[in-house]
Amino acid sequence: MANLSYWLLALFVATWTDVGLCKKRPKPGGWNTGGSRYPGQGSPGGNRYPPQGGGTWGQPHGGGWGQPHGGGWGQPHGGGWGQPHGGGWGQGGGTHNQWNKPSKPKTNMKHVAGAAAAGAVVGGLGGYMLGSAMSRPMLHFGNDWEDRYYRENMNRYPNQVYYRPVDQYNNQNNFVHDCVNITIKQHTVTTTTKGENFTETDVKMMERVVEQMCVTQYQKESQAYYDGRRSSAVLFSSPPVILLISFLIFLIVG
């Protein structure tokens, strides 16, 4: 982590230095660079520009023959035929009042970001996510008949659970309770629409199976959540990152 921070700092300083050098480089062209002269001064070929206006001979203000202000034939102010002030047909002054030209649709970045973030969330379930597939646990229910029934029907029970992020719950029990309820409800509704019904024994066994999987899901998500927080704390407490942040603040304030 420290090596990565040093590399990030070095890359930022190098980029900032290059940008600073680019800003100091003189731009090509400009006045008196050898390619043009002030009006009235001799050009390299010995000719002189007209004494005023910058147009060609007989052009008082830079237009063509008979162009008082830089337009075409019969153009008082630089527009086209029938254009009083530089617009097109029916255009009084430029880009306004164009012929019902539709504006280009603008992309809503919030919609784009929302669509990208919705990949991990199950649509229509109010923010619930679907966990990865798990192996169904081997459970014992206290008698041989139920144990045999479970082994024969375990493939009909869920092997994935629905859950919310762990930071929305105060403890494991609340997470597991919510996880079990939504998972069984969704699995029951989905299976019933396919023409298959569950008995009371099925529901009892599903509750045991899903509870075990929800506990496993909570442990996995909780570990990932705390690992992420710890990594962020270590990153922002490293000396190179602190130095980089201080340098950025100095540039912004200065």
Curated annotation (Swiss-Prot):
Binding site for Cu(2+) 1: 61-63
Location of this chain's protein in the cell: Cell membrane; Golgi apparatus
Lipidation (GPI-anchor amidated serine): 231
A matching Pfam family: Prion_octapep
Sites carrying sugar chains: 181, 197
InterPro entries: Prion, Prion/Doppel_b-ribbon_dom_sf, Prion/Doppel_prot_b-ribbon_dom, Prion_copper_b_octapeptide, Prion_N
Residues cleaved off as propeptide: 232-254
Membrane protein topology class: Lipid-anchor; GPI-anchor
Keywords, ordered alphabetically: Amyloid, Cell membrane, Copper, Disulfide bond, Glycoprotein, Golgi apparatus, GPI-anchor, Lipoprotein, Membrane, Metal-binding, Prion, Repeat, Signal, Zinc
Binding residue positions for Cu(2+) 2: 69-71
Secretion signal, residue range per the UniProt entry: 1-22
Biased composition (Gly residues): 52-95
MF terms (GO), sorted A to Z: amyloid-beta binding; aspartic-type endopeptidase inhibitor activity; copper ion binding; cupric ion binding; cuprous ion binding; glycosaminoglycan binding; identical protein binding; microtubule binding
Free-text comment about domains: The normal, monomeric form has a mainly alpha-helical structure. The disease-associated, protease-resistant form forms amyloid fibrils containing a cross-beta spine, formed by a steric zipper of superposed beta-strands. Disease mutations may favor intermolecular contacts via short beta strands, and may thereby trigger oligomerization. Contains an N-terminal region composed of octamer repeats. At low copper concentrations, the sidechains of His residues from three or four repeats contribute to the binding of a single copper ion. Alternatively, a copper ion can be bound by interaction with the sidechain and backbone amide nitrogen of a single His residue. The observed copper binding stoichiometry suggests that two repeat regions cooperate to stabilize the binding of a single copper ion. At higher copper concentrations, each octamer can bind one copper ion by interactions with the His sidechain and Gly backbone atoms.
Job of this protein: Its primary physiological function is unclear. Has cytoprotective activity against internal or environmental stresses. May play a role in neuronal development and synaptic plasticity. May be required for neuronal myelin sheath maintenance. May play a role in iron uptake and iron homeostasis. Soluble oligomers are toxic to cultured neuroblastoma cells and induce apoptosis (in vitro). Association with GPC1 (via its heparan sulfate chains) targets PRNP to lipid rafts. Also provides Cu(2+) or Zn(2+) for the ascorbate-mediated GPC1 deaminase degradation of its heparan sulfate side chains.
Family under the similarity heading: Belongs to the prion family.
Name of the protein described by the UniProt record: Major prion protein
Species in which this protein is naturally found: Cricetulus griseus (Chinese hamster)
Lineage: Eukaryota, Metazoa, Chordata, Craniata, Vertebrata
Gene assigned in the entry: PRNP
